[in-house]
From Swiss-Prot:
InterPro entries: NAD(P)-bd_dom_sf (IPR036291), SDR_fam (IPR002347). The lineage of its organism: Bacteria, Bacillati, Bacillota, Bacilli, Bacillales. NADP(+) binds at residues 10-34. Substrate binds at S140. The keyword Oxidoreductase applies. Keywords: Oxidoreductase. One of its GO terms (molecular function) is oxidoreductase activity. Its EC number is 1.-.-.-. This is Uncharacterized oxidoreductase SA2266.
Length: 231
């Protein structure tokens, strides 16, 4: 028996990169997985690699609260519960404050901060009612380390850290766990546009393994934060 047999997991941003790697690994470990993201074709491509009776594609824009609410309802209607939610949807744009690209700021705030909050508020009522569940937010090293072109992105990921820390306190003694995972540079299509090819990068699978580690700790153990860096 695999370690997540019959657990029901929702993964946002599951159409590519880190989200795809997480969804695939959770499925390999026995979970029934709901794939969420904006691009239905990409989600379906991921789903086609998995057993069809244990995967569900739900196109979802995490900046739309109603769509996120519906996502959680569909997960429960399809598989009969909700055990794991991975907030992997994210947006990284190279946008300085002094570039004055307010539309880019709004977009990152909507995806990275509001998307995290909308997903939490949609999942937590069920988890609290059943006194179990695990919410994992994919943050970033950039939430701790700022470059001259990452101010807005770094601020949004710092917010994800703060949200996770606050939730840990709010959820204490409820049986519901919450974790943030902060990757360093990961080799994805998003990062390829902004970073030199010779810079050391993690593989998306490395982040998926960190997620699995957090999920498979004993019931009385909550891993609040994991930082993953390339060496």
């Amino acid at each position: 028996m695999t370690v997540l047999t019959d657990k029901i997991a929702v993964v946002t941003g599951a159409g590519s990169g880190i989200g795809e790697a997480i969804a695939t690994l959770l499925h390999e470990e026995g979970a029934k997985v709901v794939l969420a993201g904006r691009n239905k074709d990409k989600l379906q491509n991921v789903a086609n690699q998995l057993a069809q009776d244990s995967v569900k594609v739900v196109p979802t824009d995490v900046t739309n609260k109603e769509e996120v609410d519906e996502l959680m309802k569909i997960a429960q209607q399809t598989f009969g519960g909700l055990d794991i939610v991975i907030n992997s949807a994210g947006q990284m744009l190279s946008s300085k404050i002094t570039d004055y690209q307010v539309d880019e700021w709004d977009s990152m705030i909507d995806v990275n901060i509001k998307g995290t909050l909308y997903t939490a508020q949609a999942a937590l009522p069920t988890m609290l009612e059943q006194s179990s569940g695990h919410l994992i937010n994919i943050a970033s090293i950039s939430g701790f380390e700022v470059t001259k072109s990452s101010t807005i992105y770094s601020a949004t990921k710092a917010a994800v850290h703060t949200i996770t820390q606050g939730l840990e306190k709010e959820l204490a003694k409820t049986g519901v766990k919450v974790t943030s995972i902060s990757p360093g540079m990961v080799d994805t299509a998003i990062t390829a546009a902004y970073n030199p090819s010779d810079r050391k990068k993690l593989d998306p699978q490395d982040i998926a393994e960190a997620v699995l580690y957090a999920l498979t700790q004993p019931k009385h153990v909550n891993v609040n934060e994991i930082t993953v860096r390339p060496v």
